[in-house]
């Protein structure tokens, strides 16, 4: 089992979790290929983390299975934008931590 972790990525955890759920339990090679055609920013990020986890384990992508793909919330950058009558409203810029675990596929399948 090998792991990869990407922290403080400027990405909404809610949107990233939608992509992370799609690849859980998939073959790593198939997961990377399917993420390549998704239009989300999260797809590109998660694809790189899966590739990193496979490389960390020293195995080929065709022999690896995504055991878990988890997206946790990181700190939120708070900015303010000016509004009418001298007021200011907050802008939330969320960050995420992406965690991927990859295991080697069993030979009997």
Swiss-Prot record:
Query: Cellular component GO terms, alphabetically?
Result: cytosolic large ribosomal subunit
Task: Please give the InterPro entries that the UniProt record associates with this protein.
Answer: Ribosomal_uL22, Ribosomal_uL22_bac/chlpt-type, Ribosomal_uL22_bac/org-type, Ribosomal_uL22_CS, Ribosomal_uL22_sf
**Source organism, top-level taxon:** Bacteria
**GO biological process terms held by the UniProt record:** translation
Give UniProt keywords alphabetically. Answer: Ribonucleoprotein, Ribosomal protein, RNA-binding, rRNA-binding
Q: Which HAMAP family match?
A: Ribosomal_uL22_B
Q: How does it assemble?
A: Part of the 50S ribosomal subunit.
Record PANTHER family: CHLOROPLAST 50S RIBOSOMAL PROTEIN L22-RELATED, LARGE RIBOSOMAL SUBUNIT PROTEIN UL22M
Q: What is this protein called?
A: Large ribosomal subunit protein uL22
**What is the gene called?**
rplV
